[in-house]
From Swiss-Prot:
Gene3D superfamilies: P-loop containing nucleotide triphosphate hydrolases (3.40.50.300)
Gene Ontology cellular component annotations, sorted alphabetically: cytosol; nucleolus
Assembly and interaction partners: May form homooligomeric complexes. Interacts with IRF3. Interacts with OCT4 and POU5F1.
Name under which the protein is recorded: Probable ATP-dependent RNA helicase DDX56
Amino acid sequence: MEDQEALGFEHMGLDPRLLQAVTDLGWSRPTLIQEKAIPLALEGKDLLARARTGSGKTAAYAIPMLQSLLHKKATGPVMEQAVRGLVLVPTKELARQAQAMIQQLAAYCARDVRVANVSAAEDSASQRAVLMEKPDVVVGTPSRVLSHLQQNTLKLRDSLELLVVDEADLLFSFGFEDELKSLLCHLPRIYQAFLMSATFNEDVQTLKELVLHNPVTLKLQESQLPGPDQLQQFQVVCETEEDKFLLLYALLKLSLIRGKALLFVNTLERGYRLRLFLEQFSIPSCVLNGELPLRSRCHIISQFNQGLYDCVIATDAEILGPQVKGKRRGRGSKGNKASDPESGVARGIDFHHVSAVLNFDLPPTAEAYVHRAGRTARANNPGIVLTFVLPAEQPFLGKIEDLLSGEGEAPILLPYQFQMEEIESFRYRCRDAMRSVTKQAIREARLKEIKEELLHSEKLKTYFEDNPRDLQLLRHDLPLHPAVVKPHLGHVPDYLVPAALRGLVHPRKKRRKVPFSRKAKKVKAQNPLRDFKHRGKKPKPAAKPS
């Protein structure tokens, strides 16, 4: 069986409109999970599928769902319009991403298949209006879907045909166990179901018993991460916390890390400390903060994917899961007080063309490491993962490596050959910058950013809908400036650059401009001093000869 030629999309009996959409997306052949799952799903079987992050799981369930809907509408008797597909995801960002992927695949059959996302940050009245039109597929988090079911704005008992639970191993970690059990009471007795997951844990086994009926289990024989020819993984030992900041400064300021980078930390406070530290050296970055409005978070991801930012600082949403297992993380709980329990970044969110993942803080579990590393080296693109580790953390990192590589296999985390003495000349700069980033400065920065983002998200929502181009002018990496910024730190004199790197490195340039040609003209037109043009006095007409 393994020697047989791989099954292509054109051999799966798909609707021509779906094949055209797949072609437009540039997919020449299915991934392993798509090749195995789509034919089984088209046969009407329940699926429990495990595949690593970035392997194409969304399309693996979206394509058979759309194919089933199109086939029944084309060949069966005329059916009453109703919701026939339900996709449950753990976070609002994943809901937006799943909706976008389904809509891309349904680009040539948009009149026949409509998709609605009920997890968006909209008022319930507008969502009720959307649900009254009975879209074919509804995407949402369990809490939002259950809310609509209880209000009778969404009815599934007589119409649902296909249920998808995406990132199944995260649902219980996000506190959705009770909601999910209540939601299942509103579904019909018979329906086809898919459970898609990156890991098989106890939560997935519980979900399997609740949702699936005689499922086919797909455990793909693939590593959790791409091979070393595509993904390079390194560790660098930093003797002190100060060394971590010093090394990060050198890597970014001297452009030793090229392309877009994701910086992972373990807490939001660490994220803002890191951002304010980088700000001292004119290195722009954004913090993907669950306290911010959903529109702001999605806008940050969108602009990062467009290449507007090179650095985004993020935390693991699932790190909080085991600590609050079985109950929703409340707004009054310790930690990120106002954070959205349905916001998350480490799993599933699709960041485009990430060149490097830097684990500034050591991930707490092997699973968290896999989810972080899965943000790069996607879709056959190369990537690098660099993990900063303190001496006291090395035994724990060794355990993570053993779980990833298996017993008796070669280590996958290679030592990063970096001579720290070469960048000692930068240490006094980093020490000054770290001293400026106090706890008070971090609190002020978080408060300032939340206030600004709330203003952008709520007060200007209608304006941006009417003027979408102006939304491009909204930046998320502008300086917060609660710390005392010294302008000279943004410049790197040649004598400070290590001798081995002189002439080879290119210090990071200034903030990238918005790719909007009218911006300069618009700013100039709004400034009367810059817009003023002095033409001088007109010369007096020459006197007529008498």
